[in-house]
Structure formats: structure tokens, C-alpha cells
Amino acid sequence: MQTTIFKQKSNYWRVFALCFFTAVLLFAPHCIVDAVAGGGCFHYAGDFNDQQINFYQYANAFVKNGGSFSWATDLGSGFVNSYSFYLLGSPFFWLSMVVPARLMPWAMVPLLCLKMAVAGGGGYLWARRWVRDETWSMLAGCLYAFSGFSIYNIFFNHFLDVVALFPYMLAALDDAVIDDKKGAFPFWVALNLVDNYFFFAGQAVFLIIYFFCMAAGRRYELGLRKFVRLAWETALGCACGCVLLLPAGLSLLQNPRTIDPFSGYGYLFYGKSQQYGAIFYSTLLMPDAPYFKDLFQEGILKHTSLTAYLPLVGVAGGLAFCRARERHPFTYVLKVCVACAFVPVLNSAFYALNSSYYARWYYMPILVLCGATCYLLSRPALAEQRLPRALRLTTFLTLTAVVFAVVPGKDDDGNTVYGVLDEPARFWAIFGMTMLGIVIFALLWHFCRNKRRWGAILTAAVLGFSLLYGSLHLSLTKYAQWDVDSNLIAETYDSVEDVAAALPDDAFYRIDAYGAHNNLGLWFNRSCLQFFNSTVAPSIMAFYPEVGVKRDVNSKPDAENYALRGLLSVRYTLVAKDKETEWTDKDLPGWQRTGETDAYALYENENWVPMGFTYDCYVTADQLERVSEEERAQILCRAILLDDDQISAFGSLLEPLPDEELTNRSEDAYAADCAARRAAGVAAFTATDTGFTAKTAYDADELVFFSVPYDDGFSATVNGEPAAIEKVDDGLMAVYVPAGENEIEFTYHTPGLRVSACVSAAAIAVYGVYLLGIMRKRKSQLGSKR
């Protein structure tokens, strides 16, 4: 059985406009709050504030200026690999390039509204084939655009790019298989791949599930010829969109966060039983803030995008559909996805079998759930027969959440308490809003289901309720951190000129921050030790743990690790004024207050060592392991860490560090080591947008150290001749120079980018020829019919 696409005038732009203006109304009150409170542009919480706003502004300026190496990204990282996961392939980012970089923070909300509109339009286009009623197809698009997943992931922003584009690829697959339409599917495959390679891996898995479920339900019928053509178009689309894939893949293979396999029972069972409860209730209750745990306290729940909630209608329509159409492909898809959600290894299949738990693939079955719900509602007799029972079941299951608020237990003092909730008020707000949606839907069903404009009434109700629950979610997320984030704009956007005027520009140096927001380096265009990005140079991930710094999604060296600042050429620390007393109480060696801005007190490092210097001694890995990780930076200020091969090659230039020096880790010894490194500094150092240059004038041959993350993309020359780059200190770089005056140049080229760009360019050319052939064939067929 085949389902030809519903033939009626498209209402795409009507859905687009409905979703866009609903999103405008959703964000407008919070934008007004920020403006009235003196905060300027809309800011939210967590990742949105610390990453998305500054990523968009920084990347906008970086792309316009050109370059390949970003000094403002942590200790320095390749720009492409650092930002391809977040925005570099997104069409929404490239659209934002028409906006001046300085105005990008104000463009974030319009972009969010646009993404929701595109998502709603895409959901509608996909659903109209299956729902076969324009009004109910429009509702499907609105449900998808304002699902709990979309509202939750405003927090992450760039996840909504994927939500927006995916329905178009799924609709193109249906067109290719059912209607034998050629040419569109490769385009959408390419666009989704280039938009986000990480999510595309999950999309590929889902498309396979969807394809086989459609075939099992006899909606997809294709012979060998059509199957080969579909495989060809898939491969062509992947080739067209692989421009960022190869560079990202080469980098991710070295990133420890991407290599985290399961073992034993981990394949089959989640480590905490409450994880199952959280998954179950994710379809019933509207989502809480991404950084809170209320209903369940154990398990991996924060920042996981664990929600499959649909506004107003909830899961009732999906349950009724699955009972009514047991052999429909949608039922198969939803059942397979439920199984995937509850089995760890199947859930991780959407993330290349990484054992870290996420539910960031739920938007795909949510789209099918929207289609199934509207399919049912568009058929009055079927809905009349099945929906009431499903609605009663949904109501009952939702009410069971109250148990968590009243179940008895014991507190730390042995007293009887009721409820297992950390913040009951938050729970009751979420539960109350969810129940309000159920009641409204039940009343509308009872009084309006037989009205001629029932579909339009329910669509209006869904959009109105989306404003209510969406605003509650935004409020729970945004204002819970208001005491922390209310000064975001003052400490970032508004401080750019003040900080630039306060900091000298006489040499290259890094900065640090204390008690401030993440990623100040991007705002002030300087390398900063406090940095929040998951895809920085892999050698940063290797280096930091060796000096006592946990490096997962953040670089956050403790202030007490003061010797690390000397090693990494940190000259100034920007201390938020409300944290200055806390900073001074630490009484860290070598810091003097030298100035201030409206937002920060500036402390200068008396033990600052300019970038690029030499050593008198080397230390071995065995020696360094005898020193605690938190104190190794003190030794690395005294001696460079070399492996056995490097000792054989450069041992004649350096003395082995005596073992007794390993215990000499006093503050005075650190200051003396920094003074020695300053005295052995290069004659000049210049950071460039493709790497750096340096000049040396040493009396003897030397191994010159640079605290720049090692990367295979770097090549080096000394006096114009190629030079080998040494990986030292578990992830930083050094180069050998002869005695006398020398010019060193390090140039960064993104590994794999040239190859992948050539593949994409060639594939796009082939795709163009393919489209031309399709057009000529179509024109010929039209001519023959005449």
C-alpha cells in the first residue's frame, strides 16, 4: 500500500507565521524583563548564557575577519573543530552573518523564533501526507514546534537547528520512496549533516528504523532499482555535506569524551533504577529546568533533554493511535523507540554507542507522535472510539506523580517526612500546569469535538497553552538563576570596552577570571583559562588532568593552582567585584591589584612569564608521577617534560632534573623558576589568526617551549625551513632552534578540511549534473505528453 501525498493547497506559510508569532509572544515578556532590569538583550541561563550568545558573536566576527586558529578558545584551538558542533554548519548561523557581530546578542531571540517557525513548517509538510487533512496537519506542525523537547532545548539553542531541519529530510525520504521524487533527498541529507554531524549520526539510525517500519507496514514498496537510487541519493547527500565531518571525526577520535564504551550489565540496564521512572514520566509531565532534579534524585537527569511532552494533548493521542492502528508504521516506530529509550545500548545507538546518557534524539519519535496524534484526531469516528479511554489512562498516570510528593520517609535526623522532592513548589507548578493542560483538552474534547472548526479550535488552544507552559518553563529556568545571571550583560557585553582600555596591549598574554561568567575570553578576545566548550583541541583534554585540572566540558583550574598561571603565561586575573573579598582571602602568591573596571578588579601576576621560553632541565614521566597532580605545574615551571625519544634527541641541550628538586615546591622556588623562564624568553612573540610567529637570539641551540595545545594541524618553520614540532608536557608544543637569530612560524591548517572540502565540492558538482539530468528528463516527458 502506498500513500500519495495529500493534494491540496499548502498552508506552509500559515503554519510558519503561527509558530513564529507564538514564539515572539513567548519570548517578549522575558525580553521586556531584561530590558527593564537594565540587562539589555534577552539572556536565559546556563549554556545559553555561557556559550550560545558569545559563541554566535565571536564566530560572527571571526568568520568575517578570516583565520584558522582561535586564540580566544581556551588555550587556543582550531576554529573549525571547536565550533562545527555548535554553529559553523548551521544555516541559521550563516543567515545571522548579515547582522554585525556587536549586535548578535540581540539577534538570538529572532533566530529562536525563526527556528521554531521552520520546525513547525517542516512538521506540517511531513505530516500532511499521513494525516491527509490540512487543519490537523497544521496542528501536527504546531505540536512539534512547541513540544517539550523544543521548549527545553532553548537552553542549548543550537539543538533547535536540528529540530527545525529534520522534518524536511524525513518528508523528502517519503517523497523519494512513495512518490518516486528524485533530487530533493540528497539536499536535505547534506543540509542536516553539515548542520550537526553529532545529531546526524542519530538521524541516520532513526531513518533506518523509520524505513524498515514503513516497509513492514507496507507504506514503502520499492524494487531493486528504486532501492539502488535511494542508496545513491543517500551517499550523494552525505558526500555533499561532509565538509565538516572529516575534520570533526579526526578531532573527536582524540577526544576522551567520545570514547566511553559500555561494559557488562551497562549494555542492558541503567545504573540507577530512578532513570526508568524519569524516562516514563518524560512523556507525561511538562519539562523542568535542564539543570534541576525534582521528581527523581538519582540517575543521569540534568542537561539530557529528557522530555517527550506534547502541549495540551500529551501522550493520549499517541496511546489511542497505537491501540487503534496496531499495524501502522507509526505504531512500529513508536514501539521501537520506546524500547530504545529503556535499553541503554539501544539508546546509545543514536550516539555511536557512547555510554554517556542523553535523550537528545527524542525529537524524532516526537515528530511521529505528533503525526499519530493528529491522524487520530482527524478521523472523528476513530477518535470517538479510542481517545476517551486513552485520555483517562493518561490522566491517571499523570496523577500518580503526586505519590512522590506524599510518600513517607526519614530525614537525616530520623524524623518522618513526607515527599521525596527537593523543591516541592517547583513540582507543584509543573504538575499543576500539566494537569491544567489535561483538563483543558478534556473540556475541549467534550464540548467542541463535533463543531465544524474543531481542528482550528484545538490548534488555537495548543498555541495558547504553549505560551502558558512555555513561559512557566522559561521562568523556572531563567529566574531560578537570576541572582547569578542578572549581571551577565554588565560583566560581558557592557565590559568589552572597559576591559580593553584597562588591559595593556604591549605583549601577548593570557587572562584568568574569578567569580565571573564563563568564556570571558570570547568577549574580550583573549585566551582565558576559564572556558566552556566540549570540542576544543584534544590535547587540552590530555594536558589538564596531568596538572590536577578536571577537564570535561569545562576548563576550570582552581585559583589555588597558582603555578599553572605562570606556566601558561597568565598575566591578569579579572575578579568579579562581588567576589573580591573571597579572592583576597585566598592570599595567593604574586598577585597585585593594579586597576579596576565597573565590573572587575584587575590583579596582575608578578610571576607572569611571557609566551615562549627555554629550560635548563628536563623531567621524565616517571619523575613527574611522584608529584601530586595539583603541584606538577610547579615542576613544569622548572623543567620540561620529555619522553624517551625526545631525551635521546635533545638530552644534550638540557640537564636531567635532580630528584631532590621534585620536593622543592615552595612559593619562593616558584617565583625563582618564573624569573628564570622570563630570562630565557624569546625575543618576540606574535599571535596570528593562523598560529603564531616568534624570534629568538640564543647563544646556544635550544628547545623552545610554547604553552600552545599540540595539534596535528600545526606545521612549523625555522628560518623558512620545515621544523619538527615536539609534543611536550602531555599536550603542549616545543621546537628546536639553532644558536643565533631565528624566525619561527607556526601555521595552522584544519586537518582533513581540504580533503573533505574537495569531496563536498566534487559531490555538489555531481549533484548539479544529477539535477540537470532530472530536469531534462522531466521536460522530455512533458513534451512527449503534448
Regions found by a protein language model. Give the residues of each.
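Membrane-interface helix-loop-helix junctions at transmembrane boundaries of multi-pass membrane enzymes
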Residues: 220-228, 317-341, 453
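Contiguous transmembrane helix-bundle modules in multi-pass membrane proteins
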Residues: 179-180, 199, 330-492, 739-786
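Active-site-proximal, structured, solvent-exposed surfaces of multi-pass membrane proteins
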Residues: 3-6, 55, 647-786
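Extracytoplasmic/lumenal acceptor-recognition loop(s) of multi-pass membrane glycoenzymes
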Residues: 81, 85, 462-487, 499-568, ...
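Active-site lumenal/periplasmic loops and adjacent helix-entry segments of GT-C-fold
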Residues: 29-167, 191-195, 278, 289-301, ...
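Hydrophobic alpha-helical membrane-insertion signals
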Residues: 5-81, 480-499, 503-518, 522
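Periplasmic/ER-lumenal interhelical loops and adjacent helix-loop junctions
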Residues: 47-59, 91, 226-227, 234-324, ...
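Membrane-embedded helix bundles of polyisoprenyl
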Residues: 23, 112-129, 135-217, 229-249, ...
